[in-house]
Regions:
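Bacterial Sec-dependent N-terminal signal peptides
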Residues: 1-24
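Boundary/entry segment of secreted carbohydrate-active catalytic domains
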Residues: 21-72
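Functionally critical loop-and-helix segments that line ligand-binding/catalytic clefts
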Residues: 26-43, 55, 173, 177-235
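Structural recognition of the beta-strand scaffold that forms the well-ordered cores
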Residues: 43-45, 63-68, 93-98, 124-130, ...
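Acidic-and-aromatic substrate-binding clefts and catalytic sites of carbohydrate-active enzymes
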Residues: 44-54, 70-80, 99-108, 133-138, ...
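Acidic (Asp/Glu)-rich catalytic clusters
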Residues: 53-61, 80-92, 113-122
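Catalytic domains of cell-wall/extracellular-matrix polysaccharide-remodeling enzymes
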Residues: 124-195
Length: 235
């Protein structure tokens, strides 16, 4: 989730943000036509980049918060525990994500993640942030299969895959991965349904502004409604 943001700083993109997430209409206007916005669920994803969050000031229409936990085989987000505990105490559906490194073994990345993340009933499944390309596409796919299977066996729930649209088309447009929930990052204002076989979460901007967080934050929709979101959580 941070590589895509870094790349986007190299180009000029204007995305307006408001403190009321449900009042913000993203550029992907097809979304308003194809979905009932009243039934969508709003969320943010955060890491140490957001620094100190004033949780009591966050907008009421935020339902879920996904928090960076680990990256590769060694890195642990320095704000994870604080953010994880605070999200739970403030009543949010919370999730943890791992930033996947393609040239690091899936086994060492799995050990890093489970050393930090202890999921409980009502938490979102683990999220795998896969956005770094590899010239060895087949190996990357096989390693991701191993990593996803390790997570599923350990947490007893099927992981969520986060990626951007080009990464999805190159690496995940394969029937094996259809079993997973997909969280797609796409800020270009194009029809997501025309290029994706399936998606459940949509990260529509990385330039969001909300009360309680200084600077920008990623904003997201879950498209199937609150009850459905609760249903995919850890039982």
């Amino acid at each position: 989730m941070n590589v895509l943001k870094t790349l986007l700083t190299l180009i000029l993109i204007t995305v307006s943000g408001t403190n009321n997430i449900s009042g913000e209409k993203p550029r992907n206007l097809f979304f308003l036509d194809s979905l009932d916005v009243k039934d969508t669920v709003h969320g943010i994803d955060i890491s140490f980049y957001q620094k100190k969050i004033q949780w009591h000031k966050l907008p009421n229409d935020i339902c879920f918060v996904v928090i960076k936990a680990t990256e590769g085989s060694k890195l642990k987000d320095t704000k994870f525990k604080e953010n994880w505990d605070s999200a739970g105490k403030n009543g949010y559906i919370r999730g943890a994500y791992h930033f996947y490194r393609p040239y690091v073994t899936p086994y060492s990345q799995f050990r890093n993640f489970i050393s930090v993340v202890k999921l409980k009933k009502g938490d979102l499944p683990p999220v795998v942030d896969a956005e770094i390309h590899s010239k060895y596409t087949k190996k990357l796919q096989n390693d991701l299969k191993i990593f996803l299977n390790l997570l599923e066996r350990y947490y007893k729930v099927k992981p969520i895959i986060y990626c951007n649209a080009p990464f999805y088309r190159k690496h995940f447009y394969h029937s094996y991965f259809d079993q997973y929930h997909f969280w797609i990052a796409d800020y270009r204002g194009k029809n997501l349904d025309s290029t994706m076989k399936m998606w459940d979460f949509w990260q529509y901007t990385c330039w969001g502004n909300v009360n309680g967080i200084k600077g920008y934050v990623d904003k997201n929709y879950y498209r199937w409604g609150y009850d459905s979101l609760k249903n995919i959580c850890v039982k």
